[in-house]
Regions:
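A short alpha-helical cap/connector motif
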Residues: 1-83, 87-111, 115-256
Length: 256
């Protein structure tokens, strides 16, 4: 299943009222949105029809989130759904997650693109192939180690995979407090240490299986006042049926 097809189904299942997209490019994923949307990209070239209430910012995500109130564009409402597809380097992906979670709610969903490189070359920090994921892939290992309370689901979409992250806690400072330590351990010079099980997609679930799972109802029906602990507990009880590839807390070589 193509990643855009999967993302379209995610929008349909959650019916978000607010959406954030980091990394717009030509706008193909942005075109899926039908709600109040904040889109960030310093060099977008949108070439498709957009059908949402859009606030488009030609800037970097770091600059955007450094503003006094990043939620002005949503009239103070946190992001219900976010798609992170910015600069394909671990430090940027990590900062984007930290900023996005801080402006989300416990019932929100964050989706990363480009988490399943098909070779060490494709995962290189310095791009030299036609298709490039960069070293975003270690974010799975980072979240499993530092934020084990989160529900994370790698999805085997075409062509470079997605990662769903839920059970968010906007008050968490764990990643920000350990930012330098995380990069010292998980950021590597090229060639990248991409495990064979990652190349073979053994860490990811089939897209349709994820779409058919029952955890979507937890996010869709959650109260705006639900606590992170409550959402995390409900998600864990639903997502356990997805099996070993989902939510494993073992170190799987994603960058450690």
């Amino acid at each position: 299943m193509r990643y855009l097809t999967f993302l379209d189904q995610v929008h349909a299942k959650l019916s978000p009222q607010t959406y954030l997209e980091i990394g717009v490019r030509s706008g193909t994923s942005l075109a899926l949105a039908r709600c109040r949307t904040v889109a960030i990209d310093p060099a977008f070239t949108i070439s498709v029809e957009i059908q949402c209430d859009l606030r488009l910012f030609r800037t970097t995500s770091d600059e955007y989130f450094n503003r006094p109130d990043p939620l002005v564009a949503t009239e103070g409402r946190p992001f219900d759904l976010a798609f992170i597809d910015g600069l394909h380097l671990l430090e940027f992906a990590l900062r984007d997650f930290i900023h996005t979670e801080r402006h989300s709610s416990p019932r929100s969903l964050i989706v990363f693109d480009d988490v399943l490189p098909r070779s060490p070359d494709e995962a290189a920090r310095v791009p030299h192939t036609r298709f490039w994921t960069g070293d975003v892939y270690p974010i799975m290992g980072v979240l499993r180690r530092y934020r084990p309370e989160l529900t994370i689901i790698p999805v085997d979409t075409t062509s470079r995979g997605l990662l769903l992250v839920m059970g968010l806690d906007p008050q968490s400072q764990t990643l920000a407090d350990n930012y330098d330590e995380i990069l010292a351990e998980y950021r590597h010079p090229d060639p990248q240490p991409v495990s064979q099980e990652m190349v073979d997609r053994l860490l990811a679930l089939p897209p349709q299986r994820v779409l058919d799972a029952t955890f979507w109802s937890v996010l869709a029906k959650a109260s705006a006042n639900a606590s992170p602990d409550q959402i995390q507990l409900e998600l864990a009880s639903h997502a356990a049926s997805l099996g070993a590839a989902f939510g494993s807390r073992r170190e799987s070589g994603e960058g450690a």
